[in-house]
Amino acid sequence: MSNPASKKADLRLALVECADDPDRLSRLLSDDSITDLDLRHALRGRLPAAVSAFVMEKSKFGTRQTVLGAIARSPSSAVRTALQALPGLSWRDLADVAVAAELAPAIRQKAEALLLDGITAMRLGDLITLSRIGPRRVASRLLLFADARVRAACLHNARLRDGDLCELLDHPETPREIASEILQVHRWATSYPVRRAIVRSPATPHPISLTLIAEMNPGDLRELAQSDNVPPLVSAVARRILG
């Protein structure tokens, strides 16, 4: 077992063979040569659910953050076991779990909720990374963050959709800078629904909204001209364009 890859494969096989025998599992996991990373790698593969439960509840590895991340991330873990592991995870593992489509919705949603709860305690660099790779709901929340670097990273999150930005632009706490930041990203700058939401948003500076309003289709111009929910200047310009 001197080859690292072979050692990890052998550990996974040994865990499978011991899955139904708690005494054998206990002896196996008491081996001091097994590292947290060895076990993390083994647990990420397909294993009987009993293995994850035993590791977390009855072994010395049950409080190790690295190992708990693998337990929560493994589709082989029972939902109850994965949920119990989540509070001990690093934010990176929580983000990984939250976007893993093969995991049960209850697990992904709990991981997402824990991320949202922990945002205020995270370092700026970690927030920037999370903004780029995190789940939609987390990225949407971080679009309201005061630091422009966090918002810029969010706008490059591939999981965001047009509707997320449209909802953001209608939010009462939307930063005034967000419209110009959105338009700097090609994906959003070429999205008609997003440009329309920018025009409608009270947070958008007039020079930006007035530049975009001429691109609106006739139906949207009529709606803008008649709406009481958009800035008065936007309505007035829409009426002028319509003649």
Task: Give residue spans per PLM region.
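Alpha-helical scaffold segments
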Residues: 1-243
